[in-house]
Every structure is written in C-alpha cells, then in structure tokens.
Regions:
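Hydrophobic alpha-helical segments that drive targeting, anchoring, or assembly
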Residues: 34-103
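N-terminal "first-domain core" detector
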Residues: 1-49
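Polybasic, proline/glycine-rich intrinsically disordered low-complexity segments
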Residues: 20, 26-28, 93-149
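Glutamate identity and glutamate-enriched acidic tracts
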Residues: 4, 10, 78, 126-127
C-alpha cells in the first residue's frame, strides 16, 4: 500500500527550511533596513489571531518593525540578538521572531522547539500550532498594533 503525501506549500517549505540567525543587534538593524514595507508582507502573531489572508499595508509593516525591534531590545536581556531568523539575510521572504519571554529551545536543538512569537512572510501564511497560549500582554500588544478592540 502506498500513501500519497501532499506536496509542501511554499509557506511550509520556507517555514521548515533553513534559516539564518541574526546574531548581533547591528545585524538586526541592517535586516530591518533591507525590508521594503510595501513589498507585500503578511504579519502573523502565532497563537494570537488566525493567519492573515491579506498582506499588511506599508504603514502597518513599518509600525510592526519599529515596535517589535523596541520590544526585542527591551525584553531580551542579552548583549546579542540570536532570536530572529530569516530564510535569507539579504533578501528575506520569511522572518521568524521568537518571543524573548517564551524562548524554550528556539535554536531547534529540541525535538519540539516552540513556534516563533511572530512571523513576517511574503508568502501567504498558514496556521502555526502553538501548544502554549500567547500571554495576555502579548495579545494586547498585537491588538494595539493592529488597532483592534
């Protein structure tokens, strides 16, 4: 008996594929500067809201980058970054951003690393299952960013 598996979607390929770590804070600054906010980014808060079906507008992407950068620098009490990963550091299509307050083993050395807290994707995203619900303060942060009530 043979079983057929569905081919991976582009998002699944990017999400499960090789990513490169942004190790230093100055590398994170450079990554943000290379992102075109109007290039068609989907913004995902894993475990907070359903995967978006529409790309975010340029103003929302710019606001997200500014606020996530501030959050990471304030909450990740290390001299290095190491919690942001991209499929390509020069021209990213997918960026995984781990919540500094819910890291677990984000480097992938665990059989079940936690999902990232946030994803920026130029490909339509799919739901990412998180076994741990997002903390209330992260939900409020995301809702405030999007202007939701």
């Amino acid at each position: 008996m043979t079983t057929e598996t569905s081919p991976m979607t582009e998002f699944q390929r990017l999400y499960t594929g090789r990513v490169w770590s942004v190790m230093q804070w100055d590398q994170l600054t450079a990554l943000w500067q290379r992102i075109d906010p109007a290039a068609g980014w989907y913004l995902v808060a894993v475990g907070v809201s359903p995967a978006p079906t529409l790309v975010a507008d340029a103003a929302s992407v710019s606001a997200f980058i500014k606020r996530i950068d501030a959050l990471l620098r304030a909450d990740h009490h290390e001299s290095y970054c190491g919690i942001v990963y991209a499929d390509d550091l020069e021209n990213p299509s997918l960026i995984k951003i781990y919540d500094p307050n819910n890291l677990g083993s984000s480097c992938g050395s665990s059989k079940n690393p936690p999902p990232p807290g946030w994803i920026m994707s130029r490909t339509a995203p799919e739901e990412i299952v998180s076994l741990r619900p997002a903390p209330a303060n992260r939900k409020r942060w995301w809702q405030g960013l999007l202007g939701d009530s």
